[in-house]
Amino acid sequence: MKSFAKLIFRLLCFLVLAAFVVSCFTQYIPPSKFSYVAIFSLAFPYLFLLMIIIIAVCFFINRRLAILFLVSLLLGYKNLSSTLAFNFSSEWNIQKKDSTLRLMTWNVEDFVNLLEGSEVRLKMLHLISQNNPDILCVQEFTNVEGGKWRVSVRKELDSLGYKYYFFSNDNVNTAANDVRITMRGAAIFSKLPFIDTCRFNIRKDINENAICASILFNNKPFTIYTAHLASFRLYMDTDNANKDIYKITYDRKRAVQYKLRETEQLHEKEVRIIRNFIAKSEYPLIYCGDINTTPCSYNYRFLKNDLQDAFLAKGSGIGTTFYKILPTLRIDVFLADPAFKINQCTVVQRQLSDHYPIVTDISWK
Protein backbone atom coordinates (compact mmCIF):
# COMPACT_ATOMS: atom_id res chain seq x y z
CA MET A 1 0.00 0.00 0.00
CA LYS A 2 2.87 2.33 0.88
CA SER A 3 4.61 1.69 -2.44
CA PHE A 4 1.32 2.24 -4.30
CA ALA A 5 0.90 5.64 -2.60
CA LYS A 6 4.46 6.55 -3.62
CA LEU A 7 3.69 5.54 -7.21
CA ILE A 8 0.56 7.72 -7.31
CA PHE A 9 2.48 10.64 -5.78
CA ARG A 10 5.26 10.29 -8.38
CA LEU A 11 2.72 10.08 -11.18
CA LEU A 12 0.99 13.26 -9.99
CA CYS A 13 4.36 15.00 -9.66
CA PHE A 14 5.33 14.18 -13.23
CA LEU A 15 1.92 15.27 -14.53
CA VAL A 16 2.48 18.64 -12.85
CA LEU A 17 6.00 18.76 -14.28
CA ALA A 18 4.74 18.05 -17.81
CA ALA A 19 2.07 20.76 -17.54
CA PHE A 20 4.62 23.19 -16.10
CA VAL A 21 7.09 22.59 -18.93
CA VAL A 22 4.39 23.33 -21.51
CA SER A 23 3.36 26.47 -19.59
CA CYS A 24 6.97 27.71 -19.70
CA PHE A 25 6.85 28.05 -23.49
CA THR A 26 3.43 29.66 -23.92
CA GLN A 27 4.96 32.95 -25.10
CA TYR A 28 6.37 31.14 -28.13
CA ILE A 29 3.34 29.08 -29.19
CA PRO A 30 0.73 30.82 -31.38
CA PRO A 31 -2.86 30.01 -30.33
CA SER A 32 -3.64 29.40 -34.01
CA LYS A 33 -1.24 26.42 -33.88
CA PHE A 34 -2.17 25.05 -30.44
CA SER A 35 -5.29 26.60 -28.93
CA TYR A 36 -4.81 25.00 -25.48
CA VAL A 37 -1.88 27.36 -24.97
CA ALA A 38 -4.48 29.85 -23.65
CA ILE A 39 -5.16 27.57 -20.67
CA PHE A 40 -1.48 26.84 -19.98
CA SER A 41 -0.56 30.55 -20.01
CA LEU A 42 -3.26 31.25 -17.41
CA ALA A 43 -2.10 28.30 -15.33
CA PHE A 44 1.62 29.18 -15.25
CA PRO A 45 1.69 31.05 -11.88
CA TYR A 46 -0.24 28.25 -10.18
CA LEU A 47 1.87 25.50 -11.73
CA PHE A 48 4.99 27.38 -10.61
CA LEU A 49 3.62 27.46 -7.06
CA LEU A 50 2.77 23.74 -7.24
CA MET A 51 6.33 23.01 -8.35
CA ILE A 52 7.71 24.82 -5.29
CA ILE A 53 5.39 22.83 -3.00
CA ILE A 54 6.48 19.56 -4.63
CA ILE A 55 10.15 20.52 -4.23
CA ALA A 56 9.59 21.28 -0.53
CA VAL A 57 7.88 17.91 0.03
CA CYS A 58 10.38 15.91 -2.05
CA PHE A 59 13.30 17.51 -0.22
CA PHE A 60 12.37 15.30 2.75
CA ILE A 61 11.31 12.13 0.91
CA ASN A 62 13.15 12.03 -2.43
CA ARG A 63 16.14 14.36 -2.89
CA ARG A 64 16.75 13.32 -6.51
CA LEU A 65 13.19 14.23 -7.48
CA ALA A 66 13.52 17.52 -5.61
CA ILE A 67 16.70 18.40 -7.57
CA LEU A 68 15.04 17.47 -10.89
CA PHE A 69 12.09 19.73 -10.17
CA LEU A 70 14.35 22.51 -8.87
CA VAL A 71 16.37 22.50 -12.11
CA SER A 72 13.13 22.43 -14.12
CA LEU A 73 12.07 25.69 -12.48
CA LEU A 74 14.74 27.46 -14.56
CA LEU A 75 12.58 26.82 -17.64
CA GLY A 76 10.03 29.22 -16.18
CA TYR A 77 12.38 32.21 -16.01
CA LYS A 78 10.90 34.00 -19.05
CA ASN A 79 7.29 33.69 -17.93
CA LEU A 80 8.13 34.43 -14.30
CA SER A 81 9.99 37.62 -15.26
CA SER A 82 6.96 38.67 -17.33
CA THR A 83 4.56 37.90 -14.47
CA LEU A 84 6.39 39.42 -11.51
CA ALA A 85 7.96 42.87 -11.17
CA PHE A 86 10.84 42.76 -8.72
CA ASN A 87 11.12 46.48 -7.90
CA PHE A 88 9.98 46.00 -4.32
CA SER A 89 11.70 49.17 -3.06
CA SER A 90 9.85 51.42 -5.52
CA GLU A 91 7.34 53.83 -4.00
CA TRP A 92 4.70 55.76 -5.91
CA ASN A 93 4.91 59.55 -5.64
CA ILE A 94 1.57 61.09 -6.54
CA GLN A 95 3.29 64.46 -7.03
CA LYS A 96 4.45 64.47 -10.64
CA LYS A 97 7.71 66.14 -11.63
CA ASP A 98 7.38 69.00 -14.12
CA SER A 99 9.75 67.30 -16.57
CA THR A 100 7.64 64.13 -16.80
CA LEU A 101 4.46 63.17 -18.60
CA ARG A 102 1.82 61.29 -16.63
CA LEU A 103 -0.50 58.84 -18.39
CA MET A 104 -3.33 56.67 -17.13
CA THR A 105 -4.97 53.71 -18.86
CA TRP A 106 -8.21 52.31 -17.45
CA ASN A 107 -11.01 50.02 -18.53
CA VAL A 108 -13.76 52.11 -16.96
CA GLU A 109 -16.64 49.63 -17.50
CA ASP A 110 -18.81 52.46 -18.90
CA PHE A 111 -18.09 54.38 -15.66
CA VAL A 112 -20.42 51.79 -14.09
CA ASN A 113 -23.39 54.15 -13.83
CA LEU A 114 -24.15 57.19 -15.98
CA LEU A 115 -27.04 58.36 -13.83
CA GLU A 116 -26.68 61.81 -12.37
CA GLY A 117 -25.24 61.65 -8.85
CA SER A 118 -23.88 58.10 -9.24
CA GLU A 119 -21.50 57.62 -6.33
CA VAL A 120 -19.21 55.16 -8.14
CA ARG A 121 -18.80 57.37 -11.21
CA LEU A 122 -18.04 60.41 -9.05
CA LYS A 123 -15.41 58.40 -7.15
CA MET A 124 -13.85 57.34 -10.47
CA LEU A 125 -13.69 60.95 -11.65
CA HIS A 126 -12.15 61.92 -8.30
CA LEU A 127 -9.50 59.21 -8.71
CA ILE A 128 -8.64 60.59 -12.15
CA SER A 129 -8.48 64.14 -10.77
CA GLN A 130 -6.36 63.01 -7.81
CA ASN A 131 -3.76 61.30 -10.01
CA ASN A 132 -4.01 64.13 -12.55
CA PRO A 133 -2.70 62.38 -15.70
CA ASP A 134 -1.81 64.57 -18.66
CA ILE A 135 -3.26 61.90 -20.95
CA LEU A 136 -6.07 59.50 -20.09
CA CYS A 137 -6.78 56.39 -22.19
CA VAL A 138 -10.02 54.59 -21.42
CA GLN A 139 -11.64 51.42 -22.72
CA GLU A 140 -15.29 50.33 -22.51
CA PHE A 141 -16.20 54.00 -22.53
CA THR A 142 -19.73 55.19 -23.21
CA ASN A 143 -20.88 58.78 -23.46
CA VAL A 144 -24.52 59.82 -23.54
CA GLU A 145 -26.09 63.13 -24.39
CA GLY A 146 -29.61 64.15 -23.43
CA GLY A 147 -31.97 62.52 -20.99
CA LYS A 148 -33.21 64.05 -17.78
CA TRP A 149 -31.21 61.88 -15.38
CA ARG A 150 -28.15 61.03 -17.51
CA VAL A 151 -24.81 62.82 -17.57
CA SER A 152 -22.14 63.29 -20.23
CA VAL A 153 -18.82 61.95 -18.94
CA ARG A 154 -17.12 63.79 -21.81
CA LYS A 155 -18.32 67.08 -20.33
CA GLU A 156 -17.29 66.02 -16.83
CA LEU A 157 -13.77 65.20 -18.07
CA ASP A 158 -13.70 68.49 -19.97
CA SER A 159 -14.25 70.25 -16.65
CA LEU A 160 -11.15 68.45 -15.30
CA GLY A 161 -9.02 69.98 -18.07
CA TYR A 162 -9.24 67.31 -20.77
CA LYS A 163 -10.08 69.65 -23.65
CA TYR A 164 -8.80 67.32 -26.38
CA TYR A 165 -10.36 63.94 -27.04
CA PHE A 166 -10.68 61.27 -29.70
CA PHE A 167 -12.99 58.26 -29.81
CA SER A 168 -12.98 54.88 -31.52
CA ASN A 169 -16.69 55.26 -32.34
CA ASP A 170 -17.37 51.52 -32.23
CA ASN A 171 -21.07 52.14 -31.80
CA VAL A 172 -22.60 55.62 -32.01
CA ASN A 173 -25.86 57.54 -32.32
CA THR A 174 -27.98 54.88 -30.65
CA ALA A 175 -31.28 56.41 -29.58
CA ALA A 176 -33.33 55.39 -26.56
CA ASN A 177 -36.16 57.84 -25.98
CA ASP A 178 -34.39 61.20 -25.60
CA VAL A 179 -30.98 59.66 -24.78
CA ARG A 180 -28.29 59.48 -27.48
CA ILE A 181 -25.18 57.30 -27.15
CA THR A 182 -22.70 59.52 -28.98
CA MET A 183 -19.48 57.62 -28.24
CA ARG A 184 -18.72 54.01 -27.36
CA GLY A 185 -15.47 52.05 -27.28
CA ALA A 186 -11.97 53.34 -26.54
CA ALA A 187 -11.08 57.00 -26.04
CA ILE A 188 -8.06 59.24 -25.54
CA PHE A 189 -8.47 62.37 -23.41
CA SER A 190 -5.61 64.85 -23.23
CA LYS A 191 -4.64 68.15 -21.65
CA LEU A 192 -2.15 68.57 -24.49
CA PRO A 193 -3.30 69.31 -28.05
CA PHE A 194 -3.22 66.63 -30.74
CA ILE A 195 -1.00 66.91 -33.80
CA ASP A 196 -2.91 64.15 -35.54
CA THR A 197 -5.35 61.31 -34.81
CA CYS A 198 -6.37 58.07 -36.47
CA ARG A 199 -8.50 55.00 -35.97
CA PHE A 200 -8.22 51.58 -37.58
CA ASN A 201 -10.38 48.51 -37.44
CA ILE A 202 -9.17 45.44 -35.54
CA ARG A 203 -12.38 43.40 -35.62
CA LYS A 204 -14.89 43.87 -38.41
CA ASP A 205 -17.67 41.60 -37.14
CA ILE A 206 -18.53 44.05 -34.35
CA ASN A 207 -16.74 47.16 -35.63
CA GLU A 208 -14.10 47.37 -32.89
CA ASN A 209 -11.41 49.96 -33.52
CA ALA A 210 -8.00 50.90 -32.17
CA ILE A 211 -7.18 54.60 -32.01
CA CYS A 212 -4.10 56.77 -31.80
CA ALA A 213 -3.16 60.39 -31.25
CA SER A 214 0.13 62.16 -31.93
CA ILE A 215 1.12 64.71 -29.29
CA LEU A 216 4.04 67.04 -28.55
CA PHE A 217 5.83 66.47 -25.24
CA ASN A 218 8.75 68.78 -24.47
CA ASN A 219 8.79 69.80 -28.14
CA LYS A 220 9.15 66.21 -29.34
CA PRO A 221 6.31 64.28 -31.00
CA PHE A 222 5.14 60.81 -29.99
CA THR A 223 2.09 58.69 -30.80
CA ILE A 224 -0.10 56.96 -28.23
CA TYR A 225 -2.27 53.98 -29.20
CA THR A 226 -5.07 52.36 -27.25
CA ALA A 227 -7.61 49.60 -27.86
CA HIS A 228 -9.79 47.02 -26.15
CA LEU A 229 -9.10 43.48 -27.33
CA ALA A 230 -11.99 41.01 -27.47
CA SER A 231 -13.53 40.08 -24.13
CA PHE A 232 -13.95 36.43 -23.21
CA ARG A 233 -17.62 37.00 -22.32
CA LEU A 234 -17.75 34.00 -20.02
CA TYR A 235 -20.41 35.32 -17.66
CA MET A 236 -22.66 37.55 -19.78
CA ASP A 237 -26.01 36.04 -18.76
CA THR A 238 -27.70 36.47 -15.39
CA ASP A 239 -29.10 32.95 -15.01
CA ASN A 240 -26.61 32.24 -12.23
CA ALA A 241 -26.63 35.63 -10.50
CA ASN A 242 -26.81 34.05 -7.05
CA LYS A 243 -23.81 31.74 -7.60
CA ASP A 244 -20.22 32.77 -7.05
CA ILE A 245 -18.01 33.05 -10.10
CA TYR A 246 -15.99 29.90 -9.26
CA LYS A 247 -19.17 27.80 -9.07
CA ILE A 248 -20.30 29.15 -12.45
CA THR A 249 -16.88 28.38 -13.94
CA TYR A 250 -17.01 24.80 -12.65
CA ASP A 251 -20.56 24.31 -13.93
CA ARG A 252 -19.52 25.53 -17.37
CA LYS A 253 -15.99 24.18 -17.44
CA ARG A 254 -16.27 22.75 -20.96
CA ALA A 255 -17.74 25.96 -22.40
CA VAL A 256 -15.23 28.10 -20.46
CA GLN A 257 -12.15 26.29 -21.76
CA TYR A 258 -13.52 26.41 -25.32
CA LYS A 259 -14.22 30.15 -25.02
CA LEU A 260 -10.71 30.78 -23.66
CA ARG A 261 -9.14 28.99 -26.61
CA GLU A 262 -11.40 30.61 -29.21
CA THR A 263 -10.91 34.15 -27.87
CA GLU A 264 -7.15 33.80 -27.62
CA GLN A 265 -7.10 32.84 -31.30
CA LEU A 266 -9.10 36.00 -32.01
CA HIS A 267 -6.60 38.02 -29.95
CA GLU A 268 -3.82 36.71 -32.18
CA LYS A 269 -5.54 38.22 -35.22
CA GLU A 270 -6.11 41.51 -33.39
CA VAL A 271 -2.53 41.92 -32.16
CA ARG A 272 -1.17 41.16 -35.62
CA ILE A 273 -3.28 43.98 -37.07
CA ILE A 274 -2.18 46.35 -34.29
CA ARG A 275 1.48 45.35 -34.57
CA ASN A 276 1.50 45.81 -38.33
CA PHE A 277 -0.06 49.25 -37.93
CA ILE A 278 2.17 50.58 -35.15
CA ALA A 279 5.28 49.26 -36.91
CA LYS A 280 4.71 52.09 -39.40
CA SER A 281 4.61 54.74 -36.66
CA GLU A 282 6.48 57.88 -37.65
CA TYR A 283 7.18 58.84 -34.03
CA PRO A 284 8.21 57.01 -30.83
CA LEU A 285 5.13 55.23 -29.57
CA ILE A 286 3.21 54.17 -26.51
CA TYR A 287 0.64 51.38 -26.52
CA CYS A 288 -1.72 50.99 -23.59
CA GLY A 289 -5.06 49.36 -22.96
CA ASP A 290 -7.00 46.25 -22.03
CA ILE A 291 -5.44 43.34 -23.91
CA ASN A 292 -7.52 40.63 -22.17
CA THR A 293 -4.58 38.25 -22.09
CA THR A 294 -1.83 37.56 -19.57
CA PRO A 295 1.91 38.39 -19.75
CA CYS A 296 2.61 34.67 -20.23
CA SER A 297 0.80 34.60 -23.56
CA TYR A 298 2.09 34.60 -27.11
CA ASN A 299 -0.14 37.58 -27.87
CA TYR A 300 1.37 39.71 -25.10
CA ARG A 301 4.89 38.94 -26.30
CA PHE A 302 3.98 39.60 -29.95
CA LEU A 303 2.38 42.94 -29.11
CA LYS A 304 5.13 44.03 -26.73
CA ASN A 305 7.98 43.17 -29.10
CA ASP A 306 10.78 45.66 -28.31
CA LEU A 307 8.62 47.99 -26.19
CA GLN A 308 9.15 48.45 -22.45
CA ASP A 309 6.51 47.11 -20.08
CA ALA A 310 6.19 50.00 -17.61
CA PHE A 311 4.93 47.80 -14.78
CA LEU A 312 7.84 45.38 -15.08
CA ALA A 313 10.25 48.32 -15.24
CA LYS A 314 8.98 50.22 -12.19
CA GLY A 315 6.11 48.33 -10.56
CA SER A 316 6.23 45.61 -7.93
CA GLY A 317 4.57 42.24 -7.43
CA ILE A 318 2.01 40.71 -9.79
CA GLY A 319 0.18 43.93 -10.65
CA THR A 320 -3.30 42.46 -10.98
CA THR A 321 -5.52 44.75 -13.08
CA PHE A 322 -8.68 42.60 -13.30
CA TYR A 323 -9.63 41.41 -9.84
CA LYS A 324 -12.93 39.57 -10.25
CA ILE A 325 -11.81 36.05 -11.22
CA LEU A 326 -8.16 35.27 -10.41
CA PRO A 327 -5.58 37.23 -8.41
CA THR A 328 -2.99 36.90 -11.20
CA LEU A 329 -4.76 38.64 -14.09
CA ARG A 330 -2.61 41.52 -15.29
CA ILE A 331 -4.53 41.99 -18.52
CA ASP A 332 -4.05 45.75 -18.92
CA VAL A 333 -0.68 47.05 -20.09
CA PHE A 334 1.37 50.17 -20.62
CA LEU A 335 4.08 49.60 -23.24
CA ALA A 336 6.56 52.35 -24.08
CA ASP A 337 9.11 52.95 -26.81
CA PRO A 338 12.79 52.57 -25.77
CA ALA A 339 13.11 56.33 -26.45
CA PHE A 340 11.27 56.92 -23.16
CA LYS A 341 12.50 56.56 -19.60
CA ILE A 342 9.95 54.97 -17.26
CA ASN A 343 10.13 57.09 -14.11
CA GLN A 344 7.44 55.35 -12.06
CA CYS A 345 4.43 53.11 -12.54
CA THR A 346 1.66 51.89 -10.28
CA VAL A 347 -1.60 49.95 -10.39
CA VAL A 348 -4.19 51.87 -8.35
CA GLN A 349 -6.04 49.19 -6.39
CA ARG A 350 -9.45 50.80 -6.03
CA GLN A 351 -12.44 48.56 -6.75
CA LEU A 352 -14.59 50.98 -8.74
CA SER A 353 -14.58 49.56 -12.26
CA ASP A 354 -13.92 45.83 -12.65
CA HIS A 355 -10.38 46.83 -13.68
CA TYR A 356 -7.71 48.76 -11.79
CA PRO A 357 -6.12 51.73 -13.59
CA ILE A 358 -2.41 51.88 -14.43
CA VAL A 359 -0.66 55.22 -13.92
CA THR A 360 2.79 55.84 -15.40
CA ASP A 361 5.21 58.77 -15.45
CA ILE A 362 7.63 58.95 -18.38
CA SER A 363 10.25 61.32 -19.73
CA TRP A 364 12.50 61.44 -22.77
CA LYS A 365 15.86 59.73 -22.40
Model-assigned labels for residue ranges:
Residues 1-3:
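Short, Lys/Arg-rich, polar N-terminal cytosolic tail immediately upstream
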Residues 62-84:
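Internal/C-terminal transmembrane anchor helices
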